[in-house]
A protein has these predicted regions:
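N-terminal polyanion-binding entry modules of DNA glycosylases/AP lyases
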Residues: 1-102, 106
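Catalytic DNA-binding helix-loop module of base-excision-repair DNA glycosylases/AP lyases
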Residues: 33, 37-38, 89-91, 102-139
C-alpha cells in the first residue's frame, strides 16, 4: 500500500530537489521573513524585484518599526493583498523590534501575523532548523 512506505515513496522527490536554493533572493533571516510574508499568492520573481529598494531603505526590523505604515506601503503596491501584508509586516516589526528577536521555532513563528505553518517551515528550513512536514509550493 502506498501509505505504508511513504518515506520510501518520497525518496525520488527528496533526491530530485535536495540542495536546491530557495527561489527568494534573501541575505538574512529578516529579509527571508519579509519576503515569505509577501510571497503568499504572489510570484517569487515579483517579490525578488520589489524588495530590492525596500531593503535598501529598511535594512532591519528596527528601521521598519521606527517608520510608519504610510512610508512603507508604496514599496508593496505591486504585491497581491498588499494592504494586509504591509500591516502584518509593520505589526511584526513593532512586536519584535530587532532582527535578533525573529523566532526560529514553529510555535512562535505561526504566532506572527501572516505566517502559517507552510511559511514557518520555509523559514525554518532556510535557517537550518528542524521542519515539520513537507513544504510544497504550487505556483
Amino acid at each position: 500500500m502506498l501509505f505504508e512506505n511513504w518515506k520510501e515513496n518520497l525518496e525520488p522527490l527528496i533526491d530530485k530537489y535536495k540542495g536546491r536554493k530557495h527561489p527568494l533572493h534573501y541575505n538574512n533571516t529578516y529579509q527571508l521573513l519579509i519576503m515569505v510574508i509577501l510571497s503568499a499568492q504572489d510570484s517569487d520573481a515579483n517579490i525578488n524585484n520589489i524588495t530590492i529598494p525596500f531593503f535598501e531603505k529598511y535594512s532591519n526590523l528596527e528601521s521598519i518599526s521606527n517608520s510608519n505604515i504610510e512610508e512603507i506601503t508604496p514599496y508593496f503596491t505591486k504585491v497581491k493583498n498588499y494592504p494586509t501584508k504591509t500591516t502584518w509586516i509593520f505589526e511584526i516589526a513593532k512586536l519584535l523590534k530587532t532582527d535578533n528577536n525573529i523566532p526560529i521555532n514553529l510555535i512562535d513563528l505561526v504566532a506572527l501575523k501572516g505566517i502559517g505553518r507552510k511559511s514557518a517551515n520555509v523559514i525554518l528550513r532556510e535557517t537550518n532548523q528542524k521542519t515539520e512536514g513537507i513544504i510544497v509550493d504550487l505556483h
